[in-house]
């Protein structure tokens, strides 16, 4: 994963590849030139938020239980986000150098730069992407057009009615 290098870390390539994919999508004849939505859950939720920040072509986001958020929480005695690196390696000698790299790619840090419409949802019983980590992302989003749906007894999955709410919300943002 090259987690000790910001320039060679796995997620750098993932994020840059996703931006290139959005560039490609925008060249297709099916693209209307106005509406490019991104939607994903867990790692895909993190990518959706990052893509909306990194690509001006993205017009709206639907992210559910985004991963890669507040990963350093384990270093401070709280539940951390997926992939739980600091849960397993919190005593490593180079942990503070690694934390700098992970922090750079943290979903909550991307969220601070998000000014596009976003629909977000998560379950309070999620053991993969802790609700506290998802809240850290949500609370950082400055966009005035944002909607949050919380399902108290749901884990790392989505109820059908929340899928429907997200879909209707996305359609309401068609330009």
How would you name each of these model-derived features?
Residues 26, 39, 45-56, 61, ...:
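Short glycine-enriched nucleophile-adjacent loop
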Residues 30-42:
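Alpha/beta-hydrolase fold nucleophile elbow
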Residues 49-93, 158:
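Hydrolase active-site cap/lid region
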Residues 94-110:
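Active-site nucleophile elbow and catalytic-triad environment of alpha/beta-hydrolase enzymes
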Residues 135-175:
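C-terminal catalytic histidine-bearing segment of alpha/beta-hydrolase fold enzymes
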């Amino acid at each position: 994963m090259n987690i000790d290098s910001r320039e060679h870390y796995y997620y750098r390539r993932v994020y840059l590849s996703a931006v290139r994919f959005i560039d490609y999508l925008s060249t297709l004849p099916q693209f209307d030139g106005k509406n490019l939505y991104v939607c994903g859950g867990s790692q895909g939720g993190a990518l959706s938020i990052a893509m909306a920040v990194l690509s001006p072509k993205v017009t709206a986001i639907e992210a559910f239980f985004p991963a890669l958020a507040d990963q350093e929480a384990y270093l401070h005695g709280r539940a951390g986000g997926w992939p739980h690196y600091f849960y397993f390696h919190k005593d490593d000698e180079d942990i503070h150098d690694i934390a700098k790299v992970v922090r750079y790619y943290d979903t909550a840090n991307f969220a601070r730069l998000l000014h596009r419409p976003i629909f977000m949802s998560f379950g309070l019983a999620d053991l993969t992407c802790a609700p506290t980590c998802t809240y850290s992302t949500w609370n950082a989003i400055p966009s005035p057009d944002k909607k949050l749906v919380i399902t108290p007894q749901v884990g790392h999955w989505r109820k059908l009615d929340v899928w429907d709410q997200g879909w209707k919300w996305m359609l309401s943002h068609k330009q």
